[in-house]
Amino acid sequence: MFSFFGDESKLPASTVMVSRMTVKKQAVARQQSSGPMAGPSKPSNVTPKHSHGSLKGTPRSASEKGTPKQGPSSSSKSTSKVKQEERIRLSTIPRTPASSSSPGRLKRKTPKVQVVESESSSGSESSDGALDSKPKRPKVTRKETGIDMTPLPGEEVVGRRVFCWDKVDMRGEWGRGWAGFVGCDEVVRGNVQGWANGGGGDGSKNLGKYRAFFPQEGFDRDGDFLPSVEVLYPAKGCREKFVLMVPSSDREFNPIGELRNTLRLILEHYIPPSHRHIFGTLAESLDISNPLSSLPSRMTTPLPNSLVTPPPDPASPSPAFAFEISATSTPAPSTERQETIADLIRKSLAPNRRDGPLFVTAIERYNSAMQAIQEDGTLQQWLDEGMNGGKGIKVREWAALVDFVHDQAYSRVVGGYSHELEHHPKHPEEVSKAISGKEDAYGELRHAFMSKIIEQTKLGPDSVFVDLGSGVGNCVLQASLQAGSRSYGFELLPVPAHCARLQVREVQRRWAMWALKGNLDVEVHEGDFRVHKEVGRRLREADVVLVNNEVFPSSLNMDLADMFLDLKEGAKIVSLKPFVPEGFRMNESNCDSFAAILRSTQHDYYRDWVSWKGEWGNYYVAVIDRSRRIKFEESMKGRASRRR
């Protein structure tokens, strides 16, 4: 019976997988000098004229007809037959059996003959291509080392210091330590005090938007009393009071959710390995390193003080194992997992438990353990030496930490202005003439969008970032911390500009609370960026310029093009509308336009990357490249000289 791979009754027992397919003629007598095949077959560029279906009737050469047949032994006959059947099977290209193959099909050009290698061969590639009749480009094999292998997007390391635990006290407010940040309880009460006074809250009306989370007595609001706990941040002596209540609406600030994420990120990034058995982890997804996981994994790396192989049954230990344990000076690690602080937090917050007293106990244990590693220098030593200042943290993890810290600041000083931002006053009269009414809608680029811009433009500590139309300052602050760049923003509307100033102060205090190293050279300005005195100077320094011009009128985009003529060579412009017209080709009539010095590429942004719509869209990255225009001018001069 014929199958896809040939005659099944004649197949050998063992299976050999191949990474390339080949077509070979029937073996001729080994004595022939015209076609010896000593040793393993070698690659050839010769395409065989016949397929495997015609191997049965392959005629012998003329010289072979006159040669008397020699009588091979039965073993050599068997070996020759097995080799012939092996070649027939390995040379299969998906098609019908040979008996039905037409001569026209047999004359088709076939791929180059390659060396047939088994799956166990060290040089073999994946056998997935064995069923594909199309020739494939050979894969470039890289050295299997962590240095030479290209990491996946987001898996690269940051490569710079992002933690500065020893410098956080330098950023308190007027020497008062940690009195300068807006607390969680102020947001819940809607009564922001101090330098951020007038945060747009409703005072006592805000409390009606919250309800108790824990059902036990003493965990509900009683007049002005709000159930709360104090949590210690990584910075020494920095505590924040979190209200143990939840909002009735998803649009409101959620203190319980923020508290849980605060603890999760601290346990994930700040706890030394020597103390992780005390703190534990609050990872949202399945943690393969968590001993509670019932799923075994090859990716789990044992800790240095753990057993490489699982211990035997304690009820009947083997004599050899018992001898090894008694011979060592340190006791064997316990097979019973101790309950960590994270376990208590997870249990107390479980929807089917909501155990308030247990949660308070867990937070007390956490504060005591965190204070201990702060005071004895363990935490600082781990951040400075163990993590090398955070140089080894992955880009994806670093971006998530930045996103959360900045979201804390946004919730405290910008969230209260949400109504004013959605219904902000119109533009000043002198500006409204140049801007259409549809542009009078406030919108923000989300964190994921700015992370992509940082990656594409390669923003770094030596870069200068300028945001024209910076809103509440989200992108400016993200570039200053996530990329470490000097960042400057310019916003026309008064309400977003005021929120930006508040957010800069709150964000920098949050950096200190989390012991993060951001670039403190951040400025946000209010005014028309076309006439602001600082814009020209910052544009001449800029490496990356961001402008959300999706709804700008053509007149404003023309003004921007004139301003961008001062950008230095290699500077990048990120915009939501292109500055190079579609199908633009340089000629004598347009060689003096701004588009003539740009190299522009189009990219996609995804759903929820912008605040004003939930759909995907396009954005553009243009690079200042004056060499194209210079070459065009030289070619024009050459043509003019030839005409003379």
Curated annotation (Swiss-Prot):
DOT1 domain: which residues? 297-637
Q: Enumerate composition-biased segments (Basic and acidic residues).
A: 131-146
Comp. bias regions, Polar residues: 93-103
Swiss-Prot/TrEMBL catalytic activity: L-lysyl(79)-[histone H3] + 3 S-adenosyl-L-methionine = N(6),N(6),N(6)-trimethyl-L-lysyl(79)-[histone H3] + 3 S-adenosyl-L-homocysteine + 3 H(+)
Region span, Disordered: 25-148
Matching SUPFAM superfamilies? S-adenosyl-L-methionine-dependent methyltransferases (SSF53335)
Instruction: Spell out the activity regulation.
Output: Ubiquitination of histone H2B to form H2BK123ub1 is required for efficient DOT1 methyltransferase activity on histone H3.
Skewed-composition ranges (Low complexity): 68-81, 117-127
User: Organism's domain of life?
Assistant: Eukaryota
Q: Which residues form each disulfide bond in the chain?
A: none
Is Repeat among the key words of this record?
yes
Q: Which family does it belong to?
A: Belongs to the class I-like SAM-binding methyltransferase superfamily. DOT1 family.
PANTHER family in UniProt: HISTONE H3 METHYLTRANSFERASE, HISTONE-LYSINE N-METHYLTRANSFERASE, H3 LYSINE-79 SPECIFIC
Summarizing the function annotation, the protein's role is: Histone methyltransferase that specifically trimethylates histone H3 to form H3K79me3. This methylation is required for telomere silencing and for the pachytene checkpoint during the meiotic cell cycle by allowing the recruitment of RAD9 to double strand breaks. Nucleosomes are preferred as substrate compared to free histone.
Q: Could you tell me what this protein is called?
A: Histone-lysine N-methyltransferase, H3 lysine-79 specific
* UniProt lineage: Eukaryota, Fungi, Dikarya, Basidiomycota, Agaricomycotina
* Name of encoding gene: DOT1
